């Protein structure tokens, strides 16, 4: 089978390509220019080229920087301006990697596209679904909720049945040169955030703009440094007059540049809604597990679809729900889709 492999210049994607090559597939390496500086791109492309030369496969470089900026990066900035906590990876996957890059791979005659994501594809009744990775500590299925069946059927995740701790030893044994590659330290969560998301925002908007902090009764009880520096659940970085116990951000008013704070129990919710839904065609209202944050423990809830809006009712209090984050629905370890929390 002819498969396109997205190569980042790192160990995981290189080993993904190696494992597919060992299985006898015909491969085409693809490097995506999305966000980094030209200096970084040059290094990553050099690393990807070394992997391709080792494997005896071609490498194509696709420049999607303009597309990424308008569809992902700018949306990230806009969401924070609106007082939300965005999830850019959940946008990038369907639009860039499994959108534009997949389209290009198909034009090259490839049947599928592979990446170093920690996830799996499982076919149930001849329909393809995303399944959580074997290594639950590294599982990335949360970021793939917006993919449709037809796209999922064209995906390959070679690392899905492996543990993260085993990848590097396996990769270095198979491809010894990987241990000598120069690289840059990247953010663990968002690829284009090098230090903190606040530093990224400062390049484009006024972040440090002092405002007031109110309690749930609407009384002014303190000050903050600028609403974009806070997310729901944060308990530091603002000043409360005479505070004797911890306070948590429970609300953000972007238009007024105000924070609302309360006690930990005030973060609890028993319901939430999500828009821009992307649920599998056979979805039926019922009891499921949901995640409202990456790495959060799945919570049991009743999930229903009403007028294109996902409505969730929790069995137990659920804490720290932030607008803009992805709400993702699972049946056991099978991903059924999700939406954006409103």
UniProtKB/Swiss-Prot annotation:
InterPro entries: MnmA-like, MnmA-like_C, MnmA-like_central, MnmA-like_central_sf, Rossmann-like_a/b/a_fold. Disulfide bonds join 92-191. Pfam families: tRNA_Me_trans, tRNA_Me_trans_C, tRNA_Me_trans_M. ATP binds at residues 6-13, 32, 116. It is found in: Cytoplasm. The active site is at 92 (nucleophile), 191 (cysteine persulfide intermediate). It is an enzyme of class 2 (transferase). The keyword Isomerase does not apply. This is tRNA-specific 2-thiouridylase MnmA. It comes from Helicobacter pylori (strain ATCC 700392 / 26695). The lineage of its organism: Bacteria, Pseudomonadati, Campylobacterota, Epsilonproteobacteria, Campylobacterales.
